[in-house]
Curated annotation (Swiss-Prot):
GO terms for cellular component: small ribosomal subunit. InterPro entries: NA-bd_OB-fold, Ribosomal_uS12, Ribosomal_uS12_bac. Belongs to the universal ribosomal protein uS12 family. It holds the Pfam family Ribosom_S12_S23. The keyword Ribonucleoprotein applies. Residues 1-23 are annotated as: Disordered. This is Small ribosomal subunit protein uS12. Keywords: Methylation, Ribonucleoprotein, Ribosomal protein, RNA-binding, rRNA-binding, tRNA-binding. With S4 and S5 plays an important role in translational accuracy. The modification 3-methylthioaspartic acid is found at D102.
């Protein structure tokens, strides 16, 4: 426990918070061939691998994921939300932050309905989250 005098002299150091989606904080300068700080809400990338993985206990499923090389040359694992997808290797995707709690190492989501990713078909509720257009009628 510090004394009042010690607090007056030094003060308290504020905690620095770690980013939940660190890959979104960097850009790439191709002239300098170096990473630069360039925070962005989303980033574009190319899928290098598409597959399924099993979640942690007590859940059981085959969750779809894609390994994505971003425009800043960082490679991340991103979750593909919704039922069914059209992604394959070399698909251009847009990712956002947001982890998947039962998949270790997955800290990003792919945005459906943007770039090469199609929206979820036959979706009626919560359409905006899955890139689905309003149905006719």
């Amino acid at each position: 426990m510090p004394t009042i005098n010690q607090l007056v002299r030094k003060g308290r150091k504020s905690k620095s918070s770690k980013s939940d989606a660190p890959a979104l904080n960097y850009g790439y300068n191709s002239f300098k061939k170096a990473q630069v700080k360039n925070p962005a809400p989303q980033k574009r990338g190319v899928a290098t691998r598409v597959g399924t993985m099993t979640p942690k206990k007590p859940n059981s499923a085959l969750r779809k994921y894609a390994r994505v090389r971003l425009s800043n040359l960082i490679e991340v694992t991103a979750y593909i939300p919704g039922i069914g997808h059209n992604l394959q290797e070399h698909s251009v995707v847009l990712i956002r932050g947001g982890r998947v709690k039962d998949l270790p190492g997955v800290r990003y989501h792919i945005i459906r309905g943007a770039l090469d990713t199609a929206g979820v078909t036959d979706r009626r509720q919560g359409r905006s989250k899955y890139g689905t257009k309003k149905p006719k009628g």
